């Protein structure tokens, strides 16, 4: 989005030192080098109150969530759901809080206007257009053999 001249802010719900996966840490390191992207950390949602957003991209939780959504994630989802954004809310792969296999939601779930999911439609998503909004399926190059053996 920054490459298209848009103002981009990435909000990390926590501290960079607490990032657990090597991949996430590597990606965060790349973001830190980008002058065109503003970074906010710490999970203090009050930091967002003075910012204006055209669109929110939800990437809080992914497809593997289980159990109750803990803080600060639950409050971040509530923040998204109580705001109005000119460009709406776009969920990456699945709205945070939605079980993509069953369509069930946890105690909170992002209400997206658009969901861009990858590889194939998740079984539970068409049942929940109320939280997924318009759904787009984008191919990411997963070969059939990988789907048979892994998925």
Positions of PLM-derived features:
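YjeF_N-associated NAD(P)HX repair module
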Residues: 53-151
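A cross-family phosphate/adenosyl-ligand binding-site feature
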Residues: 2-56, 61, 66-71, 123
């Amino acid at each position: 989005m920054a490459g298209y001249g848009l103002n981009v802010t990435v909000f990390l719900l926590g501290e960079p030192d607490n990032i657990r996966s090597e991949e996430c840490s590597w990606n965060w390191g790349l973001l830190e080098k980008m002058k065109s992207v503003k970074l906010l950390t710490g999970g203090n949602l009050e930091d967002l109150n003075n910012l204006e957003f055209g669109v929110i991209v939800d990437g809080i939780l992914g497809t593997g969530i289980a159990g109750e959504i803990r803080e600060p994630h639950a409050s971040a989802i509530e923040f998204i759901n109580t705001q109005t954004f000119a460009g709406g809310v776009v969920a990456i792969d699945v709205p945070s809080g939605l079980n993509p296999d069953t369509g069930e939601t946890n105690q909170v779930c992002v209400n997206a206007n658009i969901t861009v999911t990858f590889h194939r439609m998740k079984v539970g998503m068409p049942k929940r257009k109320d939280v997924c909004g318009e759904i787009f399926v984008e191919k990411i190059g997963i070969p059939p053999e990988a789907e048979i053996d892994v998925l």
